[in-house]
UniProtKB/Swiss-Prot annotation:
NCBIfam families: proB
Encoding gene (name): proB
Name by which UniProt lists this protein: Glutamate 5-kinase
Record's keyword annotation contains Transferase: yes
Domain of life: Bacteria
Species name: Bacteroides thetaiotaomicron (strain ATCC 29148 / DSM 2079 / JCM 5827 / CCUG 10774 / NCTC 10582 / VPI-5482 / E50)
A molecular-function term among this protein's GO annotations: RNA binding
Length: 360
């Protein structure tokens, strides 16, 4: 059955766009652009999250002296991003499609204001027939605030832009029930909510990127929980994007079945804000049980056992259960001093209101 998506996010990994020697595979890039153009002309809005800047720059410049990993990455990215976006511009122009470059950093998602500003920018681009091409701005990203890889960025973009599907293109067909190199292994075609995949995932990283299948799976789960279909497929297969939408039953991939529960725009932002958390709120067993139920509940002071770190009102905080496991993230309704003052008391205002609480 044909997939009727009207807006999708497509993430293309470094291993799809780079040859074995690290140079840009222009032939593969051109083929992907042809497919995106075909889908775009059929009425599908597409946001492209593209790796490949570092791989592209690696083939363009040879440092005069040995550089540390950060300097080398920034150099290759600065040179390679210009080459990458220029190539995309030329390829899409052949189809009469305009593209716009969106370079972002993790810090740009840390506040609701910056988050909405980015969303508005890309919304205007889509409304005017422009395909946003998104990548992390490696030249100014600091190591401790870099995305794990573009899988993490693509999940955030898909969520922010209310995409109906996120397609992650890698160099394998999906998630296998064994080692991908084992002929007896098969691709897991569908993954339902809550299915345990820990026995199947190998925490290995790609040759040119920073991510691996473990990262992809974690991102896919979070995005699917927000009601977005997530597909992991092989970007080196001919016509893969068109086939995924027009012949999904006959196309090998791993599909994460989305949750049917609606998630608000604010909670989507909070769900991806864990990396900006300023503190931790630890709750007792009773509060933990309430949060794990179907009941809509806020974090009340009476259920808090202790607070770690210092935070201000509206900062992101982690919610930890009575065993010390993270169960969610939320936006603080007061600062840490006020939270400590109210801790354990009845009749006090929520420290984290339900409307600004995301339970994992």
């Amino acid at each position: 059955m044909k997939q009727e998506f009207t807006r999708i996010a497509v993430k293309v990994g470094s291993n799809v766009l780079a040859r074995r020697d690290g140079t840009l595979d222009v032939t593969r890039m051109s083929a992907l652009v042809d497919q995106i153009a075909e889908l775009n002309k059929s009425g599908v809005e597409i946001i492209l999250i593209s790796s490949g800047a570092v791989a592209s720059g690696r083939s363009e410049i040879h440092p005069q002296k040995k550089l540390d990993s950060v300097d080398q990455r920034q150099l290759f990215s600065a040179v390679g991003q210009a080459k990458l976006i220029n190539r995309y511009y030329e390829l899409f122009r052949e189809h009469g499609i305009a593209v716009g470059q969106v370079l972002t950093t993790k810090e740009n998602f840390s506040t609701r204001r910056h988050y909405l500003n980015q969303k508005n920018c890309m919304t205007v681009m889509l409304e005017n027939g422009v395909i946003p091409i998104v990548n992390e701005n490696d030249t100014i990203s600091v190591s401790e605030l870099m995305f794990t890889d573009n899988d993490e960025l693509s999940g955030l973009i898909a969520s922010m832009m209310d995409a109906q599907a996120l397609i992650i293109l890698s160099n394998i067909d999906g998630i296998y029930n064994g080692s991908p190199s084992d002929p007896a292994s098969a691709v897991i075609r569908e993954i339902e909510h809550g299915k345990d995949l820990s026995n199947y995932i190998q925490a290995t990283k790609s040759s040119f990127g920073r991510g691996g299948m473990l990262t992809k799976t974690n991102i896919a789960r979070k995005v699917a929980d927000e009601g977005i279909t997530v597909i992991i497929a092989n970007g080196k297969r001919d016509n893969i994007l068109v086939d995924l939408l027009q012949q999904p039953d006959d196309t090998v991939c791993t599909r994460f079945i989305p949750s049917t529960e609606a998630v608000s725009s604010v909670k989507k932002w909070i769900a991806h804000s864990e990396g900006f958390a300023k503190g931790e709120i630890h709750i007792n067993e009773c509060a933990t049980d309430i949060l794990s139920s179907e009941k809509a509940a806020s974090i009340l002071p009476v259920g808090i056992t202790h607070i770690e770190g210092e935070f201000e009102k509206d900062d992101i905080v982690r919610i930890m259960d009575f065993l010390g496991n993270q169960v969610g993230v939320g936006k603080a309704n007061c600062d840490s001093a006020q939270a400590r003052e109210a801790m354990g008391k009845h009749g006090k205002k929520p420290v984290v209101h339900y409307d600004y609480l995301y339970i994992e």
